[in-house]
Amino acid sequence: DPAGIGPELIARLLSQPETTRQANVVLVGDPWLWAEGQRVAGTRVETVPLQSLDAARTRTDSSHAALIAIDTVRAADVHRGKAEAAGGASVLKVLDTCMDAAKRGAIDAICFAPLNKYAMKQGGLEHEDELHHFAEYLGVTGYFCEFNTLGSLWTSRVSSHVPLKDAAGYLSKD
C-alpha cells in the first residue's frame, strides 16, 4: 500500500544483506515510492534495474535486489496514512503483474508488505480480501487458506478485515 508502512518495511528488510543471500529478490513498483520508503526508513538500498519478471531467472548475481519500475500511482495521489482508491488500484496492478508472471512460470513466489483492503476495495478489489482475489485470478477452485511460516514459526490470520492497530483486541488466551 503506497500510503502505508510497506515501502519502509521492505527498505528495512532489504538493508540487511542476508535477505538477498536467501532468495533472488525482485521488487515491482513505482521508483518514487521505493525512494520514499528508503527515505522514511533512513536507509539506502542498492538495487539493479530489471526490465521484466520474465528476466528474473536470468539474473546471475542476486546479491542486490532487482527493481522492475512500473508506474502505478502518482506521488500527488498518495497521502500517507489514508486509504484511497489510487493506492488500492496501485496495489492491484502490482499484484496482478506478479500473478501473471507466476502463471507463466517466470517466478516461484510472491511476497508482499501489508495491504490496506479498504483502499484496495476503493481501487477495484471485488473480493473480501487479497487471498480470494489471488484464488480467482489464479484459477484456484479447491480449498485455499493462508499460513505464514518462518522456520518453526507459523502464523495465521485473526481476521482479514481488521486494521493492524486493532488486531490485538481480537486475541484471547482461549
Where in this protein do the model-derived segments appear?
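Glycine-rich phosphate/diphosphate-binding loop of Rossmann-like nucleotide-binding domains
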Residues: 157-174
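Mobile beta-alpha loop/short-helix "lid" or hinge segments that flank ligand
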Residues: 148-156, 160
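Contiguous, glycine/small-aliphatic-enriched amphipathic segments in soluble metabolic enzymes
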Residues: 1-131, 170-173
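FAD-binding core/adjacent interface of flavoenzyme oxidoreductases
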Residues: 135-150
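Short, well-ordered alpha-helical segments in soluble proteins
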Residues: 102, 124, 138-141, 162
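Short, acidic Gly/Pro/Ser/Thr-rich loop/turn segments
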Residues: 74-77, 154, 162-165
